[in-house]
Amino acid sequence: MRSIVMTAGCSGCGTAAVTAAVARQLALQGKKVLLVEAAAGLRRMNRLLEIREEGLFDFSDLLEGRCALENALLPTHIAGLTLLQGPSAIDWVPQAARVQLLREELSGTEQYEVLLWYCPPGAGALQKGLLPAAETLVLLTEVTPQSIEAAAKTADWWAGQGARNLRTVFNRVGRRLPRDLGYPHLDAVLDAIGARLLGMIPEGADLPYSAATGNIAARLCGESCPLLAVYRP
């Protein structure tokens, strides 16, 4: 079973939307996916996955032993995709030991093939709590100086905490690099961030967006597929 944490260096990078899209694509590719929302007080995944009714229990209830796994899960309209909704309390923080136990419990079953964790931007107690889940850490960034600087700092923090398999996704990529970016090409940006490139998502139309997130989902599962041609050096 693969365990993947998706996050960003700063807000505004589209992390929640991309995480939901990748979860959807994984399920469409035949994977059994559990999407875990670790962002407290937001429950964005309920809206993004068009789940109209909130469940009685959530991620915090499960970790703290107030319910069984089956009582905390929300089905979606997409076959193979299940949601563990985020906690309602805005100040809740997961304990790393309990996250580790949950991952081990799920790994011992054949119920899911992919655990996909939505982690809000930042580098603090909440992110530390998700470290045991980060078999792969996917860091979203936009191609702007501020976003790249934040992504580099966030990648350094995760690496310093012990995360090893760090990957980068560029979101809302145009055909050309911005003139004020300060980097001659995307390879230089990747060097600054310190994470391997996983995918690029273009600005604009739905079809390229779907193709890009589909490629990202496939690459996360070890499949060999080309990056979507977005950027022209």
Predicted regions and their residues:
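P-loop/Walker-type NTP enzyme "switch/lid" segment
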Residues: L35-E110, L207, A211
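Glycine-rich phosphate-binding loop used to anchor ATP phosphates in small-molecule kinases
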Residues: L106, E110-L126
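Well-ordered beta-strand positions
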Residues: V114, T136-L139, R167, G199
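Conserved C-terminal guanine-recognition region of P-loop GTPase G domains, centered on the G4
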Residues: A150-A163
